[in-house]
Amino acid sequence: MSPLMTATELLQTNIPNKRTELVRGRLIVREPAGYNHGRVTMNLTVRLGAYVESEGCGQLVAAETGFTLSRAPDTVRAPDVGFVRRDRLPDPATTGFPEMAPDLVVEVLSPDDRPGETLAKVGDWLEAGARLAWVIDPQRRLARIYRADGTESLLAESDALDGEDVLPGFSCPLGTIL
């Protein structure tokens, strides 16, 4: 069995044209996301970005921005979209992966995503302090919402994503991003 990797070692690892995460010290390497994944992610990012900018409430981070969620062994996850409230923003001079979870994480499923892996990822986010997680399934045209209090919701294409107490006042019909 290979030795466990640290977040610092992950930061120094370059695997061209691949997506990487660190899960309890084990390197996870995946293929780049496909077109539909990127399209749905960007559609939501544009809407979230307009809201966050108009409200001045924090900052969005782009896909593949890593966050250190736990140490010894290290876990570094990267959401497709993340939002951090203004009062929790890391120092811009910070290098490496911030040791925190965003307040909102968005995962857009790809055809090769496994349900158990997705649930484990959501669990890691919530355990590390995320307050809201949206898992969007473009193929099934639905979204599952996970909250820090343990409640869940299932949204159909005709329903709207709601920022709840993380992004109060934000609402986006799911169908408009699919």
Question: Where are the regions a protein language model picked out?
Answer:
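Gly/Pro/Ser/Thr-rich low-complexity, intrinsically disordered segments predominantly at protein N-termini
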Residues: M1-L178
